[in-house]
């Protein structure tokens, strides 16, 4: 009876080792796909920005705006007292903090740039790997490897924060809390 249990456990451990190799390969393929997709998005975004520079309609609109501003530059003694008062009272519309936050969210959703700075992230990666490497020969990193790690880590963080936000909304709250993130990681099957 014990031998059959041992053989089953042995088979499980061999199958588990094969699965980890396959998992590593699939993770590498996924990271490469993410890198390629983000490169394509960046190129498309640059192209659309370049095209927007050469649209003649915008030039005409800007010229009209400049002309209207020039006509408004009238000496102060020609403006009535009522116009001076109304001009002084009118301020630029101040946006609410919630509107600013939503605009910032839309801005980051449109862009495909990396949000974590490259140099601090590279320093963090090297610091962590130096703990596992020997003192005689530290590990060396290619820039593409660090970029792939950064891409994967940002994708992971964005997904985790999305799930955390959903859990906060489920609890009828807007503010995310530590317990939301812990529950999100627990549901995903990761350690707290």
UniProtKB/Swiss-Prot annotation:
Keyword terms: Centromere, Chromosome, DNA-binding, Nucleosome core, Nucleus, Ubl conjugation
InterPro entries assigned: Histone-fold, Histone_H2A/H2B/H3, Histone_H3/CENP-A
The record's account of how the chain is modified after translation: Ubiquitinated. Is degraded through ubiquitin-mediated proteolysis when not protected by its association to the kinetochore.
GO molecular function (one): structural constituent of chromatin
Pfam families, alphabetized: Histone
Assembly with partners or alone: Component of centromeric nucleosomes, where DNA is wrapped around a histone octamer core. The octamer contains two molecules each of H2A, H2B, CSE4/CENPA and H4 assembled in one CSE4-H4 heterotetramer and two H2A-H2B heterodimers. Interacts with the inner kinetochore.
Described purpose of this protein according to its UniProt entry: Histone H3-like nucleosomal protein that is specifically found in centromeric nucleosomes. Replaces conventional H3 in the nucleosome core of centromeric chromatin that serves as an assembly site for the inner kinetochore. Required for recruitment and assembly of kinetochore proteins, mitotic progression and chromosome segregation. May serve as an epigenetic mark that propagates centromere identity through replication and cell division.
Name of the protein in its database record: Histone H3-like centromeric protein CSE4
Species name: Kluyveromyces marxianus (Yeast)
